[in-house]
Amino acid sequence: MNTKEYKTFLSYCKASIDEKPLTISFDDFDDLSHSVFSNPHKIKQKASEIRKKFIDNIDENLLIFERKFTENGGKVHWCVSYDDFIDSLSALLAKNKIKAVNTFFSRFNTELGLEFSLKNEKIATLATDGKCAIFEPEFGIVNTGSLFSIFNSAYDMEIVMGSKLKIFIIPINKFVCNIAEIDIMSTLLSIYRNQNDSPFLSSIFTPNSHKDSASHVFLIDNGRSNILASKTHRKALWCIDCDACKRVCPVFNTIGDKPYNNVFTGPYANVVLPFYENFDSYKHLSFNSVGCGNCTRVCPVNIPLTDLMIENRRFFFEKKIMDLGDELLCSRLKKFLLSRREMNKKTWLKRRKIKVFIKSSVLKNRNTPAFAKQSFNGLKIQK
């Protein structure tokens, strides 16, 4: 891995590691789910089934949502990338002669570069006339064509719901199939994102109930469909953006946000960024893990993040996306470790060969992997 992104990532990581020690403990994480639910593991399983049901039929479900939302009096815009979104949004604002909008911070807004784009279009982002608001709901609801939103304050809710032109932006994976599923998903989101047992202030918006205003929703892909082709990797799209995985990740809590140089950070970024952006620039993130499994254990929708990082490594190797040096090293190690003849040799000899395979710079601050004194094969022969 000899890319500019990888070198920058390493430089930031080294600076962070020098400042604080690495620990894999997450005993201080206050998991309220055990006090809210009698069986939190069952609830997590139910939530993962809800997300899987939508993602496995995402194309059909999104078309149903479009039909329902349109029937309710709203307008749906499809956007493949953030460029498509910005172009469509600019055209919509120009058509309605909007010179100022109310925007609200969200990671998706940052991903799309919304504030920067509006500034370039000379559109103010703090309106006082109540004409237009741009907001990201938490979930779309397929069977009713509605949008479920959580607000930070009653004032924010009043601004959004009171605007004459309501513009909602939502990634294509943040939907549930029916309104009954909102209860579980919103409670889990509140617990794992905000450490509260229920959302502070929420609303379900259906265009038909606001006939005095225009409602538009932008369904935005922005790389998410790249991951749908793999039945294994598509599990990452179950994510509800709670960030619980970050709080328990020893690597993230050591290096922080800065090395990623992206709106996506932490274990989730390690899995999806190579697909959302490009393999060459972000494949190194899939090796950015100690394999402790904390992120997998804490995830409220049971995304196997640790397994997906390992699956990414296998995918890169099989598709020959690895750098030549790394590919040769992996091939040699694989051949060595799968050889019965080699594994039956004495421990000190195997240890010495590993040192030959792995550069001394890698082993500078860590011990050489240790082999057991006797292999399973040797034990079986003795018996």
Q: Where on the chain are the PLM-derived regions?
A:
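Ferredoxin-type iron-sulfur electron-transfer modules in oxidoreductases and energy-metabolism complexes
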Residues: 209-236, 252-359
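The feature marks the mature, well-folded catalytic cores of soluble enzymes
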Residues: 1-232
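Phosphate-binding glycine-rich loops and their immediate beta-loop-alpha structural context
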Residues: 239, 243-246
